[in-house]
């Protein structure tokens, strides 16, 4: 029995075809599929024309950022049209991250990429989700917000001038060009997130130098910006889950009226936590500093992409 798994964002979709022995037969990429922003014909064109498979799948599991509860029936219908006779299931990217990280065990699942999202997962379903709100109102921990903090630092002077000079050379932009990218051109969030490789490179390069050197001091200044981004993610997104679990275990009267308590059979204490996404992957050290060293959470996995975990989940 062949299984087809998709992990889709707005820009690209990663596909893996798995055979009956659990082996990966084929992997490929197509355009991103987001049913919120795309017409049926556009989605079907990608599924039927861009996705070329050596064999027909019997099961199709699609995880995407645009697959809300309201969009699930429509996405399932499109998958059924593209793969007649196959069992199909469309889910959001958050449940995909949770399954990839924890399988059927409970945990706090987090996505840290261009944007940020998180949820409390009971091993089957999402129990609680702090709304991410996007990079203007929220998205703490994301690449877009890290880029925003970085630009604020270089232009307002909280980061060393040498970093600003190197960044302007690296990006080929000046102050008016950056303002234009952020406020006048589309997809400002992607532009802001595109700054993160520079930040990562500068930290890695600076850490090669001895204590007291300018390069190391500059790297540590950038490291503190990354830490502040992850602190904000913890405080604004993770604390609600922790408070909910603690109230369920210690005093259910603290729960909001009508809220069901966290299932005591899922274990004592705060559930384990895991992360998916490029920002979590490339900034693993500061992420662990904040989550493990400062807040004493049990970080079990940090994955750049969820596909490996999804394959394990669907072939177990």
Language-model features: locations:
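ATP-binding/phosphotransfer module of carbohydrate and carboxylate kinases, centering on a glycine-rich
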Residues: 1-59, 78, 82, 101-108, ...
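Anionic group-transfer/hydrolysis microenvironments
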Residues: 9, 16, 65, 95, ...
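Residues in well-ordered beta-strands of folded domains
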Residues: 31, 63, 119, 131, ...
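Polybasic, low-complexity association/targeting segments
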Residues: 61-68
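Phosphate-binding/catalytic loop of phosphoryl-transfer enzymes
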Residues: 68-165
């Amino acid at each position: 029995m062949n299984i087809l798994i998709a992990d889709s964002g707005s820009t690209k979709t990663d596909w893996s075809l798995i055979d009956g022995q659990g082996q990966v037969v084929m992997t490929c990429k197509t355009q991103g599929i987001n049913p919120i922003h795309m017409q049926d014909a556009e989605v079907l064109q990608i599924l039927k024309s861009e996705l070329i498979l050596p064999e027909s799948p019997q099961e199709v599991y699609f995880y995407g950022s645009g697959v809300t509860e309201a969009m699930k029936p429509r996405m399932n219908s499109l998958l059924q049209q593209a793969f007649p006779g196959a069992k199909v299931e469309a889910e959001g990217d958050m449940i995909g991250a949770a399954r990839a990280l924890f399988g059927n065990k409970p945990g706090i699942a987090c996505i840290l990429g261009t944007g940020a999202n998180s949820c409390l997962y009971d091993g089957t379903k999402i129990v609680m989700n702090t709304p991410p709100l996007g990079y203007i109102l929220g998205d703490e921990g994301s690449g877009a917000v890290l880029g925003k903090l970085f630009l604020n630092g270089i232009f307002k002077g909280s980061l060393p001038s040498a970093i600003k000079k190197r960044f302007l050379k690296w990006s080929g932009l000046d102050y008016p060009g950056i303002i234009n990218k952020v406020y006048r051109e589309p997809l400002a969030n992607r532009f802001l997130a595109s700054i993160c490789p520079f930040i990562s490179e500068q930290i890695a390069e600076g850490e090669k130098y001895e204590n007291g050197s300018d390069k190391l001091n500059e790297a540590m200044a950038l490291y503190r910006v990354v830490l502040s981004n992850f602190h904000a993610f913890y405080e604004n997104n993770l604390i609600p889950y922790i408070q909910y679990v603690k109230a369920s275990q210690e005093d259910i009267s603290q729960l909001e009226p009508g809220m069901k308590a966290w299932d005591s059979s899922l274990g004592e204490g705060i559930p384990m936590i895991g992360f998916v996404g490029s920002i979590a992957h490339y900034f693993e050290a500061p992420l662990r500093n904040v989550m493990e060293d400062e807040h004493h959470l049990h970080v079990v996995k940090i994955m750049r992409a969820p596909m490996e975990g999804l394959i394990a989940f669907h072939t177990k």
